[in-house]
Regions:
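Bacterial Sec-dependent signal peptides at the C-terminal "C-region" and cleavage site
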Residues: 8, 12-23
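Short, solvent-exposed loop/turn segments at secondary-structure junctions
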Residues: 31-32, 86, 113-115, 185, ...
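Helical hinge/lid and interdomain linker segments adjacent to catalytic or ligand-binding clefts
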Residues: 21-116
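Extracellular ligand-binding/catalytic regions of CAZymes and related secreted enzymes
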Residues: 20-22, 48, 215-298
Length: 298
């Protein structure tokens, strides 16, 4: 009996040991979007889960010398890209590529897929991009049609979106991926931009979520890939086009959406560790109703 009690105490003690937090960095500081809001919303979402410790790497302002901008990627299991601005210095670019090539975890968030149209390796890391002069020379359009991901080499601009509105996301062939496992097949996302006509040279790994870009909302009339993983060497890369930042943290529906935050949290763990240990929360949105977490807290 005494031996059983000791074993039970040891087991309970093991269960109570806190999981080691994941160290991550958000690269930000220049963007055509409201980066002070987006970077803080991402930091709050990750840190308030208790699973992450997040630093901010803030670049010099647009037009200022970039020579001193550096990130020590060796300190991090996770890199979140929230940057669309001036080119990084060569040493920074090479350090990022070394991190990715070594199997690092990367989240490509929203307008980070607008950045660096002439950097070939970056465009393969993000798979799809838009704006900044992208066209048929940047790679094919990719969209979901008749149960398959289509690659369309038609000439035309890369990147557009209609008016911001709530829309339904559908989980596709990545439904059993650890990031999506247990989530509903369809769920309602809060008011947001819906990127369409994105194109690029990269290879989508698991297509996780698509949405219909409704022509009535000035969309493409296609089922657009908005959330996916990217095949690039040993790296674990998650690309989400969701999450247009609002004017303030308090008025930021696309990032206050529970679905956005849950995907971000699960993806961050997967990118860093290759697994997802988080349960599906009770407040996850349904196909009919948006769910919000205004304070960015589970």
């Amino acid at each position: 009996m005494r031996r059983f009690a000791i074993l039970l105490l040891l087991a309970l003690g093991a269960c109570s040991v806190p999981q080691q937090t994941i160290r991550g960095v958000i690269i930000t500081g220049q963007n055509n979007h409201n980066w002070p809001v987006s970077s803080e919303a991402i930091r709050l979402t990750l840190e308030q889960s208790g699973r992450f410790e997040i630093d901010l790497a803030v670049s010099p302002p647009a037009g200022a010398p970039m020579d001193s901008f550096r990130v020590d990627f060796s300190r991090y299991e996770l890199v979140v890209l929230d940057y669309n601005g001036d080119p990084w210095p060569e040493e920074m670019r090479q350090a990022f590529l070394d991190y990715v090539d070594a199997g690092g975890g990367v989240i490509v968030y929203h307008a980070a897929d607008n950045a660096f149209p002439d950097w070939e390796a970056y465009n393969r890391i993000i798979a799809l991009g838009g704006w900044e002069g992208r066209d048929e020379h940047s790679g094919p359009y990719q969209y979901w049609q008749d149960g398959a991901l289509v690659q369309d080499t038609t000439a035309g601009r890369g990147g557009s979106h209609g008016v911001r509105h709530p829309y339904v996301l559908t989980c596709r062939r990545g439904a059993e991926h650890p990031i999506l496992k247990g989530l509903p097949v369809q769920w309602m996302h809060a008011e947001d931009e819906l990127y369409d006509r994105m194109r690029g040279p990269g290879e989508i790994g698991d297509l996780l979520c698509t949405a219909w870009a409704d022509p009535a909302q000035r969309g493409s009339g296609r089922e657009e890939p908005l959330v996916f993983t990217v095949n690039y060497g040993k790296a674990r890369i998650f690309h989400t086009m969701l999450g247009h930042a609002g004017p303030t943290l308090e008025d930021n529906p696309a990032m206050q959406c529970t679905g956005f935050q849950v995907l971000l949290l699960r993806a961050a763990e997967w990118c860093a560790r290759g697994r997802v240990t988080q349960p599906v929360p009770a407040d996850f949105p349904t196909a009919e109703a948006v769910s919000l977490r205004p304070g960015y807290r589970p």
